Amino acid sequence: MVTANSTVKVGNVTFSNSAPLALIAGPCQMETRDHAFEMAGRLKEMTDKLGIGLVYKSSFDKANRTSLKAARGIGLEKALEVFSDLKKEYGFPVLTDIHTEEQCAAVAPVVDVLQIPAFLCRQTDLLIAAARTGRVVNVKKGQFLAPWDMKNVLAKITESGNPNVLATERGVSFGYNTLVSDMRALPIMAGLGAPVIFDATHSVQQPGGQGGSTGGQREFVETLARAAVAVGVAGLFIETHEDPDNAPSDGPNMVPIDKMPALLEKLMAFDRIAKAL
């Protein structure tokens, strides 16, 4: 039986629960080519300065929107061209989420990490298709799922022959329009063998909380991120934007990009202490 690797390499970035903190970051959705390059360039500069391994993320299609009229992204074909050019320009690996089995084969030649959205984390055919590409697979734990139930989710990937899987905690449903973060989930998921990522921005979402769109409490991103890093994780997932209040999706929980350097500097200090103990 194939088991999950405790250390997963994505290009030049290492994810391990005992290694220095790595970062998955970028805007929620890919808006335009120019915007992607602006965000990527700023993230590359700050992470190089701080010595943090960066995987750049963005979504080509936000398939799970609150409203039918909500913006969804620039689409698969255009996004793959941009991802390819970003990799050539900046040399970092990239991540995007996929929603159907057919998308796996199209995305895998360009994208380094295929991400399974939380609401799709139990979709067996999707997990198998992602695993069979040979790419690293990052699975978001469903808001409805206990952390120990991720054992079966990860097994669908590893038993399809792919040990390179990441497990991401992004909060659990707590009544209506609210998520909470149970920090016990982090060591429980780490005990399953895979590197654990904490999604600090989706964890402060208020799903559907604005009626026609999702709300959020970005003022608590740092609080939860500090707690997760103090517990000990392989990496953080943080969505960021230069103007979150006018972003096409997930603005209320994204971190303004000009706040990112100071935030990352604090979190790296917590990480060094946590992993030295």
Curated annotation (Swiss-Prot):
InterPro entries: Aldolase_TIM, DAHP1/KDSA, KDO8P_synthase. It is found in: Cytoplasm. The keyword Cytoplasm applies. Keywords: Cytoplasm, Lipopolysaccharide biosynthesis, Transferase. Its EC number is 2.5.1.55. Pathway: Carbohydrate biosynthesis; 3-deoxy-D-manno-octulosonate biosynthesis; 3-deoxy-D-manno-octulosonate from D-ribulose 5-phosphate: step 2/3; Bacterial outer membrane biogenesis; lipopolysaccharide biosynthesis. SUPFAM superfamilies: Aldolase (SSF51569). It is an enzyme of class 2 (transferase). The keyword Cytoplasm applies. GO terms for biological process: keto-3-deoxy-D-manno-octulosonic acid biosynthetic process. It comes from the Bacteria. It catalyses: D-arabinose 5-phosphate + phosphoenolpyruvate + H2O = 3-deoxy-alpha-D-manno-2-octulosonate-8-phosphate + phosphate. This is 2-dehydro-3-deoxyphosphooctonate aldolase. It comes from Brucella melitensis biotype 1 (strain ATCC 23456 / CCUG 17765 / NCTC 10094 / 16M).
